[in-house]
Amino acid sequence: MSCSCLCMSLYRGADRIGRFYTAHCPQDMALCMHRQKLNPLALALAAAFALNAPAALADDEEPPIAVPAPPKEPGQTVVHADDMDGEMSVILHAKGNVVATRDDQRVESDWLDYYQTKNRVKAGDRFRMTRGGDVITGTTLDYNVDTYSGTGMDPVFSMARQNQTAVKPAPGAPPAKPVTLRGDGSQVDFQGQNQYRVYGSRMTTCDPGDEAWYLKSSRTDLDYNTGVGVAHNAWMQFYGVPILYSPWLDFPLNSNRKSGFLMPTFKTGSSGTEFSLPYYWNIAPNYDATITPHINVKHGNMLAGEFRYLQPDYSGRIYTEQLPKDKLTGESRYAWSASHSQNFGHGLSFGMDFNQVSDNNYFTDFGDQVAIASNVNLNREAWLNYALGWQGGGGNVTLRAQRYQNLTINPVPGDIPYAKMPQLTFNANQSLPSGFSANLISDLTRFDHPSLQNAERLVLYPSVSWNFDRSWGFLRPKLGVNYTHYNLDAFQGSPSHVQTRTLPIFSTDAGLYFDRDTQFLGRDHLMTLEPRLFYVNIPNNRDQNSLPMFDTSVNDINFAQLFTENRYSGYDRINGANQITTALTSRFIDQSNGLERLRLAVGKRFYLKDDVTQTVNQPSSDLLLSAGGDLTREWRFDSSYQYNQQLGMTERYNAQLRYNPAAGKIASVRYRFGRYEQLDNSNNYGPMRQVDVAAQWPIARRWYAIGRYNYSFIERKPIERLAGFEYNDGCWSLRMYSQRYVTDPTTTKNAWFFQLELKGLGALGNNGVQDTLRLAVPGYTKINE
């Protein structure tokens, strides 16, 4: 028989004299009643238990045997109190140190009325409720423990529960981290197990006792099923000062993605003062979009949009910026960028990358230093690739179409790269017995240019190599033939014609490895000695000046280039060679921690015959030297030196010293010298002598200074100056700095950055701050991570 039950076990002299619970009656229950008041027999039995109970015991006496209550079951309500009375199965009145529990819900109060039939609780004059990791205190409570619904007055709360996974994260995404939300209000409505509505609320994610910032709103809805909070008629207040108003503002209750407005961006400088307010649309776990209106005082209103998608077999991104009419030029200005990659399976894949802006000055007017430096030729390409595999080898076939938008101001024909319309490549390798392997590089390309000669070019480069690798050294000879065929179009009165070039190429790479234990700076080290020889023979006696230059340039000489067959990039020029490279490397490795304390290297190439592709030949290359290492865990030194022995002059050198004892503590100084270097993106060349000092360093409790000074001794002026500070309060962080940098010999840009980052909500300010600081200060660390 199912019924409501009352059971009391009374202890004489104890603080708490009763316990009340409702449940299905167990078989050994002594007392069970239907909905009626306690009759005289029940009261007599209860009194008899109380009168016959022994007196309270001293500490050394055995405790009495009490009649135990049935174990708590799911869905069971248990009430503890100093004093209880009521009507069986109808209402229970509890007073004094009241504690009521049901599953994960717990209510503590001065008094409590429990209505059994409705599973409803009324409590006051103070209450404290905990459920699901949340804690709410207040004055009065009216609450249904079955439906998790009700109302509390004058609430003070701390919400720290996990997301209830109603919205699944994207595949492979890390679990969402909870955000501890503290606050108060005039009233809280409990709207289910995972939902709240707070009226007259103030909320913050700062630690207890810290109210540096809070969100004040007329009403806030917290939904832990979706992990999203929504504030209505909301003011963001920072140290009591309103800094942002929104009639509707949503925010994350964990680290999951969500739809809603992101923090606004403020920036000012040579490009004008700008305000932007992004809206993030979490369309699905694998689709999202960001729509950003920009209000630019100097140029006008711009709209930007980004759409991203991700599927198991493909992914991509589309981005645009649209300015219908520039206030300065009166013209429409825009930027487009799109990328897509797709795997069709069975080795077949596809990709594309497309970029376009309305004019050559677009990034100068709207971009930052990073955008200006990296966008001279905007890439537009699409490719289809097929990967093959077979026993002992593999290969791939790629079909590509590629051209560029060149942003050089007043370009000459040589500034504009050739388009590849199209390019077909096939590369393969096959392992052979006894360490041999066969290799093939092939390339068929149609080159197209608006003002230079067009042509088709075929390159075939088969080769055979042998790898002999041991712990003490290696030997890797290689023999191949490079065949190049050109079909040149008619150009400037010259008829179309064919040119070919066939060159055998032989190379051998060999090295030895020696090591021994030694003492260095008073510590045990492993010292290595690593000599290396690289020989190349290309019997090229042909003058190649009649051949076009489609995708070829002279590589800068460095240690990596010393060990290549060709000093040119691309296939239009192949140097004649009978040359040998010698190099020696020595390292000191700390045996206690594995740090490379010191690394020394020297290398030089010797030419045994003249190269017909060079107008001036030398008996040897420049001498290359390098030194570096972790002097300690905090100190790092790197340097390189290039010396022209024929001229008796230094070509270039670079030295850098960096001190990094801890995160947020970094200082570096670098000196660069070049006799003839590219100075900017406009292909201006000349001598370079620059010193570059950068640092991020704590200057007081919670305060960090950050700066960079890059000075040119040739131009006698700074190339870049950056100075500012950062403040980390724990609950919020602030970054403010100014930057001035040169974009070309006649143009200098200024920028001022501001970013206020609120714990748990994100950053208020310029979204490019982190990229700028990491570029300016090597080793920069975000102080609130």
Swiss-Prot record:
GO terms for cellular component: cell outer membrane; transporter complex. Its main location: membrane. GO terms for biological process: Gram-negative-bacterium-type cell outer membrane assembly; lipopolysaccharide transport. Keywords: Cell outer membrane, Membrane, Signal. The keyword Signal applies. Belongs to the LptD family. This is LPS-assembly protein LptD. The gene is lptD.
